[in-house]
Amino acid sequence: MPSFRDDHIIVIQTGSLYHRATFGLAESLEPPTIRVRTRVGKNDNGEYVFTNKEDINMEDPNVKTDETKVETSESTSEQPSNSNVTEEKNMGSSFHSECKVDDFTPLPNEIQPIQRGRVVDWEALKAFWKHLYSLLLKDPNDTTFRYPVCLVIPTYWSLYDRELATQFFFEECQVPGFTIAYEPLMGLYAIGILHGLVIDIGYEKTDITPILDGQIIFTATQQLPLGGRYMTQHLQNLLRESLPTLKSSGQYVSKEDITELFAEQVKCSEIAQVVRDEQDTAKDPVKALTSTNNVEEEDPAEDIGKIIASGQTRAYLAQKEREKNGESEKDEKPDNTDVEFQTIAIEPLGDCIVGRERFKICEPIFHRPSNETVSLPEAIYITIKNYAANYKRRNDLWENIIVLGCGSRIRGFRECLIQQLQFKYQLSGSLEPYYAAQGTDSILGMTTMPPTPYPALINPCKILPDYFPSWKPDAGTNAMFEELAFLGGSIVAKTSFNESVSSHYVTLEEYAQHGPTAIHTKQ
């Protein structure tokens, strides 16, 4: 069986809010070249209509659009000592949102074919896929070449859903090869490990998936009805309680103008940030690292392991470089958390001044929003403790926590989540050993037998291999760490479609012989 050329391979990742896709894989795998809002509309004639081509994010993946750059201040004079004057000066710099406003402009009779990760309208989704396929190819009607497709999907798509997807791409797109990959497993493949706990923060849901030895534990997967949109709606309510101010007129923004799109633009900007609690500093590796720096003269030996575990290695090295060069911190801009108000450009209102509500976006995620559901840290604990594995393998999950999904793209989200887990569940200090010794669950408040084992170490797994330079934070591309599942799908597509035998994908001959059910034999 001849292999396919890398520049002929198509990778598509499904999503409730956006589809991500690329046509052709480079030698060094790159971020998706196209991101399309997952929606279709219907005109008066009953025909499907789609987003205009100009509204689709089709920038060159090797060029990063700096949409969150702060405007240069007109004044270059020495910074005044008065804190109020400093704050006014910082407010004069307007931030910009990464939110694509055109993507939220409603279509006529708009349909969202995928909701909470599940397909709710197959006819609309097929029409959308056909539109997406035509965007990827310059001439979809050209029969000279046919291109294999790797489709990255959630773990909970049913067998029937996978069969319908297989049938569509073979019969409608005439692909010569087709395979399906699971999103959480692709996140592990991208990093290069075989076990871990994958947390995917989506648009309307959060998926928690434990993986051991490269195998998904399907019986232990959980889904919470909390996602990026839930955080946006929470921010919208906060802004309506404490109204932002229009910079041009000095008047409050009316409640009617504080729409979900208004809150989405604030959330998708640099002024939005998760501020971690200042509780139990000793258990927080980042804060412990900071406190260690303050007493560096007393203890010159630096804890390298603590620096790496904090996830702030780059920032730490940059700080050391500045100290080495004798640069003063007084010349640096104040931290976002130290500024009471920030100015952001909101379409179509203009510059608006937003207060500290921008720090409370993730409150319903980290703290139980209601009695009907649990918080994200509680769900993670319950997943590992009750379902995922026996106590001998639980540390493999606690020590490899991966946070994916663009719902987690708010600055400080990962660090805050790890801090919450460490504060509540990590076996350190005086409280947790007592509960562990007594056989009492400190969270659920009940006696357990045998004693509940608490992890001795909770770590995020966020180190990318060096052979993916386009995905590095300083690579100057539009890569997002939250899209690592797409990178893993590209890895699987590159290796699967280059095999001499079709052991991991369905060929056109196999489809003609066995039909759509052939996809179940390739996973």
Curated annotation (Swiss-Prot):
Entry superkingdom: Eukaryota
GO terms under cellular component: actin cytoskeleton; chromatin; cytosol; nucleus; RSC-type complex; SWI/SNF complex
One Gene Ontology biological process: regulation of transcription by RNA polymerase II
Keywords: Chromatin regulator, Cytoplasm, Nucleus, Transcription, Transcription regulation
Keyword Transcription regulation part of the UniProt annotation: yes
Nucleus among keywords: yes
Pfam families with a match to the protein in the record: Actin
Compositionally biased residues, Polar residues: 79-92
Disordered, as annotated region: 56-92, 319-339
Cell compartment(s), UniProt: Cytoplasm; Nucleus
SUPFAM superfamilies registered for this protein in UniProt: Actin-like ATPase domain
InterPro entries reported in the protein's UniProt record: Actin, ATPase_NBD
Listed transmembrane segments: none
Biased composition (Basic and acidic residues): 56-72, 319-336
Protein function: Component of the chromatin structure remodeling complex (RSC), which is involved in transcription regulation and nucleosome positioning. Controls particularly membrane and organelle development genes. Part of the SWI/SNF complex, an ATP-dependent chromatin remodeling complex, required for the positive and negative regulation of gene expression of a large number of genes. It changes chromatin structure by altering DNA-histone contacts within a nucleosome, leading eventually to a change in nucleosome position, thus facilitating or repressing binding of gene-specific transcription factors.
Family stated for the protein in its record: Belongs to the actin family.
Subunit composition and interactions: Component of the RSC complex composed of at least arp9, arp42, rsc1, rsc4, rsc7, rsc9, rsc58, sfh1, snf21, ssr1, ssr2, ssr3 and ssr4. The complex interacts with histone and histone variant components of centromeric chromatin. Component of the SWI/SNF global transcription activator complex composed of at least arp9, arp42, snf5, snf22, snf30, sbf59, sol1, ssr1, ssr2, ssr3, ssr4 and tfg3.
Protein name according to UniProt: SWI/SNF and RSC complexes subunit arp9
Species of origin: Schizosaccharomyces pombe (strain 972 / ATCC 24843) (Fission yeast)
Organism phylogeny: Eukaryota, Fungi, Dikarya, Ascomycota, Taphrinomycotina
Gene (name only): arp9
